[in-house]
C-alpha cells in the first residue's frame, strides 16, 4: 500500500481528546468520510487489496462498518450483509453476545444471509479489543460461512484486538494505527 496515501488517510481522521470522558483520546472516523478524497482513497485501497481474492459477501458491523463495508462490497461487486444490534432486522436472525467493559451486548444477522461455504470479508471502522468483530465472526461461522479476512480503517494496537482475531485464524488488515487508548 502506498505510504503517502495511508498518511493522507490518517491525516483526515480527527483526534478528539477527553471524549467521551476524560483521559480518552477519540479517533473520529466521521471526519474521514466527510472528506471526499479521503473517503474515496480509503475505499480504493481496500478494493485494491482485496480484488484479487475470492469472496462471496462482505459483512459490516453496526454502525460504522456499514460506511466502509457497503461501498467496498459495491466496488468488489459483492453482496453486503449488515450485522445489527437486536431488534433491527425483520427476518429470522442468528444472535451472538459479547462482553463490554461494563456488561454485555448482542449482535444479530439474518439466518439466511450467508450460505454454508460462502467466503466472507468482515469490515469495520475500528479495531480496539476485537470483541464486536469476534462476535460477528462467530455468527458467520455458525451460519457455515468461512471467515479468513477482516479489514479495519483504524487500529488501536495497544488494546489487543489484532491478536484476538489472529487467534481465530483471521488475517487482519488495518490502514492506520493509533497507539494508546
Swiss-Prot record:
Primary residence: cytoplasm
Subcellular localization, as worded in the UniProt entry: Cytoplasm
Family annotation (InterPro entries): Ade_phspho_trans (IPR005764), Adenine_PRTase (IPR050120), PRibTrfase_dom (IPR000836), PRTase-like (IPR029057)
Enzyme class per UniProt: transferase
Catalytic reactions of this protein: AMP + diphosphate = 5-phospho-alpha-D-ribose 1-diphosphate + adenine
Its EC number(s): 2.4.2.7
Coiled coil region boundaries: none
Entry superkingdom: Bacteria
Any single Pfam family the record assigns to this protein: Pribosyltran
Keyword set, alphabetical order: Cytoplasm, Glycosyltransferase, Purine salvage, Transferase
Signal peptide: none
A GO CC annotation given for this chain: cytosol
GO molecular function per UniProt: adenine phosphoribosyltransferase activity
Pathway: Purine metabolism; AMP biosynthesis via salvage pathway; AMP from adenine: step 1/1
Key word Isomerase present: no
Gene Ontology terms describing biological process: adenine salvage; AMP salvage; purine ribonucleoside salvage
Subunit structure, as described in the record: Homodimer.
Role noted for this protein: Catalyzes a salvage reaction resulting in the formation of AMP, that is energically less costly than de novo synthesis.
NCBIfam families named in the record: apt, PRK02304.1-1, PRK02304.1-3, PRK02304.1-5
PANTHER family (alphabetical): ADENINE PHOSPHORIBOSYLTRANSFERASE (PTHR11776), PHOSPHORIBOSYLTRANSFERASE DOMAIN-CONTAINING PROTEIN (PTHR11776:SF7)
Family: Belongs to the purine/pyrimidine phosphoribosyltransferase family.
Protein name (database record): Adenine phosphoribosyltransferase
Native source organism of the sequence: Tolumonas auensis (strain DSM 9187 / NBRC 110442 / TA 4)
Gene: apt
